[in-house]
Amino acid sequence: MLKWYVINTKANNELLAIKKLKKENYNVYCPMYLSVVKHARKIRKILKPFFPGYLFIRLDIEKDSWISINYMIGVKKLLDDGKFPTALDHGIIDEIMLKIN
């Protein structure tokens, strides 16, 4: 059964991890917001993650090869309880998507 899990990424590597995970056909979600950055009389708008250092991934841990995720570029680890990844409660990601979009 597909459930949402949390990935802890290496510092400022969310986009790299997303790229690598999507290349392997994983369903990944990283809520972002537009930030205005002022530097040396220039104003830039950049996308930043709402949860820096974290991504959400939708997996079926009984079917998907989740152990390899921990070894992907940009990924620190898939959050777990010591043995298996810890799934988020049903509906949390849906609520985040509704509030952000």
Model-inferred region functions:
Residues 1-101:
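Acidic-enriched and Gly/Ser
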